[in-house]
Design a protein with these regions (language model features):
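N-terminal membrane topogenesis motif
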Residues: 1-73, 117, 121, 127, ...
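Signature of the first transmembrane helix
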Residues: 23-43, 52-110, 141, 202, ...
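Membrane-water interface segments that mark the loop-to-transmembrane alpha-helix transition
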Residues: 28, 55-72, 97, 102-148, ...
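Interhelical loop/hinge segments that connect adjacent transmembrane helices in multipass membrane
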Residues: 38-57, 188-193, 215-222, 231-274, ...
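Transmembrane helical elements of multi-pass membrane transporters/channels
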Residues: 60-79, 196-201, 217-237, 249-316, ...
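Helix-loop junctions and terminal segments of transmembrane helices
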Residues: 75, 105-124, 183, 300-326, ...
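Interfacial segments at transmembrane-helix termini and the short loops linking adjacent helices
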Residues: 86-92, 148-164, 287, 354-384, ...
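Hydrophobic alpha-helical transmembrane segments
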Residues: 157-165, 191-241, 259, 297, ...
Length: 458
């Protein structure tokens, strides 16, 4: 009897302890806050003892996949929220501003991430990468201001652009710290940082829009949330969990700008190629069509994201494989394998869109997308080509031959400009979709030929 009573008391004690124990999220936040405050009082973030091990392949894939997925799903999810709460016109304005923010983000990123993480011997210091990124983010802000001034934006649209541009600027700055974590083989921590920033942005935007019905205030709140996550989590985490880097030199900053300029130019041109049809629609078609185009574009973007989840965690290892001449055939097999994966994902996405995709989009956005079924199919095919284009360019960067692709992107940009202006003017929204598809097809063919030539000559 005493034993039974003792067991009952022990069970009750455990239950009471569990009730008193705060939720896991609260415990993690408290632990992080204690660690952060302790580091601040000690006078140095970089001298703290790392608590997390490197070389965690499974964690790298899981956290990077979640982080990349949340980051990629951020735009479509926020567009869904805006469409449901403020209608297609307001959502179209937000969608257009976010597209332009994504475009000028390439100025802030400057094509450095792949170069940074494949710098396995740390030829350039982390301090140099940080300073270079601050400079490009300042340039990004200047480009955004200049664009809004030239377009004559005012009122609600101007503030929407301000909020989205600010958010993407913070996102660009955070990328250099997450790149440092990946370079130190702690990619999963970079993924965790990305998840936190995006989740806070989604929550803040949604709550602010629900409370105020103001897209501009929601965008500004989103930017503030991202800034807090950068200052209170991403930057301290990077200093805590990576080795102290040597001091920076001015020559290193110059070298990063020079070496990554071809990558920046190519990626910026690629983003321009994707954006030109949307530029052509602005002023010609109502803002609603920006929403429709970007919604079916998300299908293409999803394919690129899915393929990126396969190969991006392995960029450092691919660089090491390429550095050994005896492993070049293995390198080629990896290229073929990932291209095959892209084809399979494209086929799966096409089948999904043909069965439930249109109905799902109509439900999520609160508007009928049946009239855009054919355009959705065409955009899915373009997405498969886009995924391979992105992959091949990353590989060319790993091979340090990125300058060879710049001419190709310039040609493709010219093709996209001519097609977009001509087709949108003559046949409207359908013309924007056809222009995007044909531009991606031209770029795909030219880039495949370029890669074959590099391998043949190298």
């Amino acid at each position: 009897m005493r034993t039974t009573n003792g067991r009952v008391r022990n069970a009750r004690a455990v239950q009471d302890e569990n009730r008193a124990r705060p939720p896991m999220v609260v415990r993690l936040a408290n632990q992080w806050w204690d660690r952060l405050i302790g580091a601040v009082f000690s006078g140095s973030l970089a001298n703290q003892t790392a608590r997390y091990a490197a070389h965690r392949t499974t964690r790298d894939y899981v956290f990077n996949s979640v982080g990349f997925g949340v980051w990629g799903f951020l735009f479509p999810l926020l567009t869904m929220v805006a469409s449901q709460l403020v209608g297609t016109e307001g959502a179209g304005m937000f969608s257009m501003a976010f597209v332009y923010a994504n475009l000028i983000q390439f100025v802030g990123m400057y094509g450095v991430r792949t170069y940074q993480v494949s710098d396995v011997d740390e030829m350039d210091s982390f301090g140099a990468y940080q300073i270079q990124r601050v400079l490009t983010c300042i340039l990004m802000v200047g480009v955004g201001y200049l664009y809004c001034s030239l377009r004559g934006y005012a009122g609600e649209l101007l503030w929407i652009c301000f909020g989205t541009f600010a958010f993407r600027t913070v996102d660009s700055l955070a990328d250099v710290y997450e790149g440092r974590l990946q370079q130190q083989d702690k990619l999963w921590l970079g993924g965790a940082s990305q998840v936190l920033r995006c989740v806070l942005a989604i929550i803040t935007f949604s709550v602010a829009l629900l409370a105020t019905r103001s897209v501009s205030l929601a965008c500004i709140g989103m930017a503030i949330a991202a800034t807090l996550s950068l200052v209170l989590f991403t930057i301290p985490l990077t200093y805590f969990e990576t080795e102290r880097s040597r001091g920076w030199e001015l020559l290193e900053i110059r070298e990063i700008f020079v070496e990554c300029f071809p990558t920046f130019l190519a990626t910026f041109l690629f983003s321009l190629i994707e954006t030109v049809p949307k530029f052509a629609m602005e002023g010609t078609l109502p803002y609603d069509y920006q929403l429709y185009f970007n919604t079916i574009y998300f299908s293409a973007q999803g394919i690129t994201m899915a393929v990126g989840l396969v190969y991006k965690p392995q960029l450092v290892r691919l660089a090491n494989i390429w550095s050994n001449p005896s492993h070049r055939k293995r390198f080629d097999l990896i290229i073929l394998a990932i291209t095959g994966v892209a084809a399979l994902i494209t086929a799966a996405m096409f089948a999904f869109n043909a069965t439930v995709g249109v109905a799902l989009l109509s439900l999520l956005y609160g508007t009928d997308f049946e009239a855009y079924r054919t355009q959705l199919y065409l955009m899915t095919i373009a997405g498969g080509m886009t995924a391979v284009i992105d992959f091949l360019y990353q590989i060319i960067t790993v091979l340090r031959r990125q300058e060879t692709a710049t001419r190709i992107y310039l040609i493709a940009f010219g093709v996209a400009g001519v097609l977009s202006i001509t087709l949108v003017t003559t046949i409207g929204f359908d013309g924007a979709v056809y222009a995007y598809l044909l531009s991606m097809a031209a770029l795909f063919v030219m880039l495949v030929v370029q890669y074959v030539m590099i391998r043949k000559n190298g």
